Amino acid sequence: MQLNSKFARNRAEEYGFDLWGDFIIPPYFQRLELLQSNKPWVIEGGRGTGKTMLLRYLCHQTQFSASKTDYTENDFERIGIYWKMDVQFAKLMQLRGQDDYLWINAFINMGVLIITREILICLKNIRDSQYIHYAEELHNITFESLRDIDNDIPESLDDFIKYIHNKYKKFQLWVSNYSHIEEHPIFYPLIFVEELIDIIHNNVDIFKSTTFCVYIDEYENLIPTQKKIINTWIKHSQSPLIFNIAMKHNSLDIRETLGEEQIVAVHDYRAIDLDKQLDGYFKVFASEILLLKICEDIDHTILENKAWLFDVSAIKLRNDSRYKTCIINKLKKLFPSRSPKEIASDMLLDSRISARIWEDISKDLENKNSEVTIQDFMDLDASPEAYVILHALLCRKHNPKHIYDELVKYSNEEDSKFIDWIHNNLVGCILNIYGKTSRRCPLFSGFETFVLLAKDNIRHFLELCYTSLAQSQNSEVQDNLCVDIDNQVIAVKNVSQDMLYEVKQFGKEGNQLFGIALRLGTIMEQARKNDAQSEPEQTHFSISGELDEETMFILNELLKWSVLYKTKLTKQKNIEYGEEYQLNPIYSPYFLISYRKKRRMEFTNKEFRLICLGDEREFNDFLKNREKHNNIQTQQLSIF
């Protein structure tokens, strides 16, 4: 199994702007109604949900791709313009001894130049494409009426493109060397784009009703004044020029415009949450993306209906249950797994792990002066999963004889408390035992596990799959299109570590967010190490009390960058309101904690502030106090 560099691509930027033949139509595409609505869209989504790929698919480089062989008049109704902000350059347009007025006009000019350039390039590509019906009109189009704004604008399309390109280079030079260049260039107002569109409408028949939709990516990286400019454009958007934005969650922190108005949901724009749109579809959609890569790189026969992936009209066919089952089964075969009960069986066959299990049970019985001996338990020849959780049960406040009696019932297939005990404790006990023995835990393998670890992040899912395939390629154990479990577990641990350390790069607060992720993971790891497993699989938490402004800002950053995920609080002491937060499951293998959302821990607002802002001494004291508290609870815990 040989993988090439193209297989490793998991970011939109690695594909370029023309995605024809690479972009798989998402199952929610028809619901977006992007092609029908003239109201701006605010597209939100966590990292890896496909925001940039969606925008680039909607824009002219893809819709008028050289690889596309057939156009219809409908393709000309809406033309997309993609604009990803040059963040470092945009941030130069502030302060530096000048008031906001200069930099507001400078930023508007930058936007106008970029949008103009993209519209002109789109016209040129259509003119030079296989769609020749209106090539003559595009060859003959002139732009001399724009000379009312800039007298130097050339007449022809090709010369105009060069002119705008040079204007933008000179503008960049002026911004970068502002203090050394006294006179600033002519700033184009937004009406320049509107006049350009009017010329196109009046001179090329196929464009007479075209709406140009600008898609601004990574809105969250703009400074406040620049956000107000974009908000103003959104507020006043109307055909034939519509402005749309895409951003991470919690990024629409400024709603003001340059005037006294604010942008308001529904009235001024419609919000699209890609995480919600993917809900219920992620497993199959992510599988299709991976299978397309495999089809192109490894096995050309693995996708029987490849053309469906690029056809909007085939979405219904892809939603058929038989199709989805077929897709998922291919991935389950590629990334096999072991169930918790199968893993428990393997553990008792592993001499090192088995010895540790029986050693712990023996010590428990000795410490409790038990009448029941370890041999009594062994003679029952009970199922492996029962023995795996036995140490946790014996660590609780109880009589070993009661546990023995319940195990007898379970072994005889009678009604027994072991049924619930195994259900509630097996995964936590497996994790704890593998942690003690420093062995690779097979719970972190399998397609279904990859889906849970990725948590609707396509990039994370692809990285887990690619790294597993690469690990298998480098291993002595190879089987075409089937990655052995041990290779999967090695790969998952490496990906988890890489994703955790990547947090350092998450914006200007990255180092702080990384430290908080480490602290939260450490707290959950500490809970996992509790031998009694009194609260197994604690991977999410709630916060009681209101947070101060500083801590709330940090929490929002954690959510924005998907270090944490927020959901409505599940029932708590007959109260059903508030939020709870889950540490991103992709970090679970690093800390050897569960990736499942099972049990919640609770922090007070002061405790969460300490986790976010406390120094090392304060945090270590906090950990020690939690451990002491958990030990007291364990001593008091009864399993009956």
Give a label for each model feature.
Residues N74-E144, I272-L290:
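P-loop NTPase motor core
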Residues A454-C465:
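The conserved phosphate-sensing helix
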Residues M1-K84, M93-G97, Y101, N105:
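Walker A/P-loop-proximal flanking segment of P-loop NTPase domains
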Residues Q533-F640:
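Long, compositionally biased intrinsically disordered regions
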Residues D217-N221:
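Walker B catalytic acidic pair
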Residues H133-F192:
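Conserved P-loop NTPase mechanochemical-coupling segment
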